Amino acid sequence: MATSRYEPVAEIGVGAYGTVYKARDPHSGHFVALKSVRVPNGGGAGGGLPISTVREVALLRRLEAFEHPNVVRLMDVCATARTDRETKVTLVFEHVDQDLRTYLDKAPPPGLPVETIKDLMRQFLRGLDFLHANCIVHRDLKPENILVTSGGTVKLADFGLARIYSYQMALTPVVVTLWYRAPEVLLQSTYATPVDMWSVGCIFAEMFRRKPLFCGNSEADQLGKIFDLIGLPPEDDWPRDVSLPRGAFSPRGPRPVQSVVPELEESGAQLLLEMLTFNPHKRISAFRALQHSYLHKAEGDAE
């Protein structure tokens, strides 16, 4: 497929992943989002795309067969230009007009109703559970890559493309936010699917607050802001061989969740704390979070 088949409509934005365009498919009349990223060529005599990139795209194309409603569709992939050193790859996604950041900003005061937040969270977690069940760690969840359709359907975007995006991000002078990063990522420790659940907790709180929960300006500052809420973790939970020792942080105890998200009732506060658990092995999974009582009872029901 050639991207010339699509008619560009507008530039949506320039981010860490490159430039994104809204385009129209004249055959179907549907709008799509085009993301062009540069990928370094693989080794060997033939050059071309590295096998890791080919595998990554192949996995995402296989996911298409499931047509999960809470995951953005990757409709096509094509290599559009090539030099000796790199190949320009264009990813064709379904187009969704707004992200969660825009959706939250558009909500009139005092913000989204609690039942709307619960509905968004259920959809968010279903999409994430689907990715995790297919061994995909998102690694960069934030309001800007959670899309919300005009009908209120949540769709996760920019997942499963870590290797494709890493080269482009190194070329792009965009500061990648630390605000949604899990402690194990900030400490440069090993990580897996629980990193996404930390991000979910930050976003869950932000749906109520209408502003980010932890706004650090460096890894150490971000960790300090996290510990101001959850307390300094015990030595047993601190990962070994990491960039910052536990002793670099002053001792402090946890604060009540309601001190930063006063709108949360007790079971919601409990769910948030299970997401914002320092030790990733003790952090709640997307699957278990979906079973949590908070997401299944109407506001005002007895605890």
Swiss-Prot record:
Domain named Protein kinase: residues: 6-295
Activation/inhibition comment: Both phosphorylation at Thr-172 and binding of a D-type cyclin are necessary for enzymatic activity. Full activation of the cyclin-D-CDK4 complex appears to require other factors such as recruitment of the substrate via a substrate recruitment motif, and/or formation of the CDKN1B ternary complex. Inhibited by INK4 family members. In resting cells, the non-tyrosine-phosphorylated form of CDKN1B prevents phosphorylation at Thr-172 and inactivation, while, in proliferating cells, tyrosine phosphorylation of CDKN1B allows phosphorylation of Thr-172 of CDK4 and subsequent activation.
Start and end residues of each stretch annotated as Required for binding D-type cyclins: 50-56
Reactions the enzyme catalyzes: L-seryl-[protein] + ATP = O-phospho-L-seryl-[protein] + ADP + H(+); L-threonyl-[protein] + ATP = O-phospho-L-threonyl-[protein] + ADP + H(+)
Active site positions, chain numbering: 140 (proton acceptor)
Signal peptide start and end residues: none
Pfam families in UniProt: Pkinase
Main localization, broad class: cytoplasm
Documented EC number(s): 2.7.11.22
Protein residues bound to ATP: 12-20, 35
InterPro entries: CDK, Kinase-like_dom_sf, Prot_kinase_dom, Protein_kinase_ATP_BS, Ser/Thr_kinase_AS
Residues the record lists as N-acetylalanine modifications: 2
Keywords: Acetylation, ATP-binding, Cell cycle, Cell division, Cytoplasm, Kinase, Membrane, Nucleotide-binding, Nucleus, Phosphoprotein, Proto-oncogene, Serine/threonine-protein kinase, Transferase
Modification Phosphothreonine, positions: 172
GO cellular component terms, A-Z: bicellular tight junction; chromatin; cyclin D1-CDK4 complex; cyclin D2-CDK4 complex; cyclin D3-CDK4 complex; cytosol; nuclear membrane; nucleolus
Gene Ontology biological-process entries: cell division; cellular response to interleukin-4; cellular response to ionomycin; cellular response to lipopolysaccharide; cellular response to phorbol 13-acetate 12-myristate; G1/S transition of mitotic cell cycle; positive regulation of fibroblast proliferation; positive regulation of G2/M transition of mitotic cell cycle
Subcellular location: Cytoplasm; Nucleus; Nucleus membrane
GO MF term set: ATP binding; cyclin binding; cyclin-dependent protein serine/threonine kinase activity; protein serine kinase activity
SUPFAM superfamilies assigned: Protein kinase-like (PK-like)
Family: Belongs to the protein kinase superfamily. CMGC Ser/Thr protein kinase family. CDC2/CDKX subfamily.
Subunit structure: Component of the D-CDK4 complex, composed of CDK4 and some D-type G1 cyclin (CCND1, CCND2 or CCND3). Interacts directly in the complex with CCND1, CCND2 or CCND3. Interacts with SEI1 and ZNF655. Forms a ternary complex, cyclin D-CDK4-CDKN1B, involved in modulating CDK4 enzymatic activity. Interacts directly with CDKN1B (phosphorylated on 'Tyr-88' and 'Tyr-89'); the interaction allows assembly of the cyclin D-CDK4 complex, Thr-172 phosphorylation, nuclear translocation and enhances the cyclin D-CDK4 complex activity.
Function in brief: Ser/Thr-kinase component of cyclin D-CDK4 (DC) complexes that phosphorylate and inhibit members of the retinoblastoma (RB) protein family including RB1 and regulate the cell-cycle during G(1)/S transition. Phosphorylation of RB1 allows dissociation of the transcription factor E2F from the RB/E2F complexes and the subsequent transcription of E2F target genes which are responsible for the progression through the G(1) phase. Hypophosphorylates RB1 in early G(1) phase. Cyclin D-CDK4 complexes are major integrators of various mitogenenic and antimitogenic signals.
Record protein name field: Cyclin-dependent kinase 4
Organism: Ovis aries
